[in-house]
Amino acid sequence: MFEEIESKWTEDSGDYDDMIQKQLSDKRTVSYWTKELKKLLGPEPLRILEVGCGPGFMSIIAARLGHEVKAVDGSSGMVEKARRNMQHYHQTVEICQED
């Protein structure tokens, strides 16, 4: 069962990544989520575990705010996209595939 789910999310990872790229290139979207995470997380650096990170949008925002982020996803495709995005956006986030 897990293999079927992982396969589906990996198959869709390109579409999700396209959506993330559009969001990250939209200053209003990035500004909105940056403000929301600041309110939610507070000013002190935290250790954050994002489960179901997909291509890594929230992990990128949290890392930009100075938090230590570990991002986990069950899909090898999503993990691959998240790793590429962390490198592209110059963020240090530990990313791993877990179910």
Can you describe what each PLM-predicted range is?
Residues 1-43:
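Conserved class I S-adenosyl-L-methionine
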Residues 49, 55-99:
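Class I SAM-dependent methyltransferase SAM/SAH-binding core
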